[in-house]
Amino acid sequence: MLQMGKAREPNFLILFFFGLILAFGISSEGSQIRHYKWEVEYMFWAPDCNENIVMGINGQFPGPTIRANAGDTVVVELINKLHTEGVVIHWHGILQRGTPWADGTASISQCAINPGETFFYNFTVDNPGTFFYHGHLGMQRSAGLYGSLIVDPPQGKKEPFHYDGEINLLLSDWWHQSIHKQEVGLSSKPIRWIGEPQTILLNGRGQFDCSIAAKYDSNLEPCKLKGSEPCAPYIFHVMPKKTYRIRIASTTALAALNFAIGNHPLLVVEADGNYVQPFYTSDIDIYSGESYSVLITTDQNPSENYWVSVGTRGRHPNTPPGLTLLNYLPNSVSKLPTSPPPETPAWDDFDRSKNFTYRITAAMGSPKPPVKSNRRIFLLNTQNVINGYVKWAINDVSLALPPTPYLGAMKFNLLHAFDQNPPPEVFPEDYDIDTPPTNEKTKIGNGVYQFKIGEIVDVILQNANMMKENLSEIHPWHLHGHDFWVLGYGDGKFTAEEESSLNLKNPPLRNTVVIFPYGWTAIRFVADNPGVWAFHCHIEPHLHMGMGVVFAEGVEKVGRIPTKALACGGTAKSLINNP
């Protein structure tokens, strides 16, 4: 009897401690479970001092910041309170190893969450870094559905650089026209382009019809703000003689941006959640989908405040710079700097943009890429007309997502859910990237590039002339489910001669990369994350117009997928027939 009682005691203790783990959200390895309950809904807001409708979370715009340590589990209970729209949220830069269904891409990883429904996102944040989240259905990111996601090192570990304080900055662009009107315009004959944004927002705040720097330009209307308005500048409060880390992420729908602080050099230390070899610069270019950490030292005249300026690059500017203050405490925020804000470099100075981008290399000790790849895919970016509609296409295929999510369709072998013929992996060698496209074979499609697990893949992104003469645009491309090595950039068409210029020594790891006008960008990644993953231009209207592809790898190895992720299209029928 006594022996039996002793045998049961450890089991009771195990259950007791397991209960504590659940109650306090602490895993057995010291990581935590961080639970959030979010309600997504439209609400009236005035991001740039003009009232409009934004998509917010729990009454906040931008949405709440998620903060966790590497190794933590994040659980987001998402309730869709939109009246007539579905919703999903993509966790930008989070690899979703083991949870591809939680990537938050409608028609790829999951079904859209219907109005009134609740969906639980449950995933592990593996790596420290500066990330963010955003809507990934239609153009909901442009409507304001985004927020910050910051991952600190695991408990007991430190960053490889010192700083005394931290400032988190989320950059976005804002239109007064609704996303629904924008979507209809983009899908019309003839196309109605969305135009340039009205305002650049810093942490969801900007000024459309006034300027906080009006004293330097008599043509500008001064702002008369008390500081409590939703459009009042988000002030960077700092103490003199300290080092601050500024985490910067761009959720813009269209704009490429330039960030600068008057009189303060920026030390770049992180890009897309990966450490880089530190380097100083006066300003940084940041494209949609990218994130950076920069360090600044507050060693300037402590009796002054300094301008923080965010201007547009890469497109002919029709949007004033977003402004705020670096406020040296205890100075009053009403004390404006003695000089004008930093001037944004010329919008079309692409050499300057390239020089900044080329300086980004991996920090010492970072993982190196495999020496050779098993497979190489060339992706030609072109603008085309299909049945009178203006579309973007990759290798003459404009992506239109199917009603059944790829992940479920491939998991349950639903062969009719999407085109079983893979898209082209090359484009014609004689294609002239310097002239407008004339190929009449461009089509709408939804085929998939499939990889074997462990396959080492090179992707060559090739830019080209648009339909208008002498015009080629910057495109930032984002890959879900992976980081990749950026092996190189170049002007013109990629050829075999470019092979020797590829960087295999210290290429940076990124999840978003830019291709410059009339140029190419080469990346390499390992297909080691079972799932189905989007790879697309992060400019919202370009993706809406078909500028993306879909990668799949090892779907047969994917574990159980939550039923709610598949409750639409052909997978819904499978669930009904096979409960």
UniProtKB/Swiss-Prot annotation:
Positions that bind Cu cation 2: H92, H134, H538
Location relative to the cell: Secreted
Keywords tagged on the record: Copper, Disulfide bond, Glycoprotein, Metal-binding, Oxidoreductase, Repeat, Secreted, Signal
Record GO terms (molecular function): copper ion binding; L-ascorbate oxidase activity
Signal peptide residue numbers: 1-30
EC number: 1.10.3.3
PROSITE patterns on file: MULTICOPPER_OXIDASE1 (PS00079), MULTICOPPER_OXIDASE2 (PS00080)
Boundaries of every Plastocyanin-like domain copy: 33-152, 164-330, 374-553
Disulfide pattern: C49-C231, C111-C568, C210-C223
Glycosylation-annotated residues: N122, N355, N470
Top EC class of this enzyme: oxidoreductase
Binding positions for Cu cation 3 per the UniProt entry: H136, H480, H536
Needed co-factor(s): Cu cation
Top-rank lineage group of the source organism: Eukaryota
Subunit comment: Dimer.
NCBIfam families per record: ascorbase (TIGR03388)
Name used for this protein in its record: L-ascorbate oxidase
Lineage: Eukaryota, Viridiplantae, Streptophyta, Embryophyta, Tracheophyta
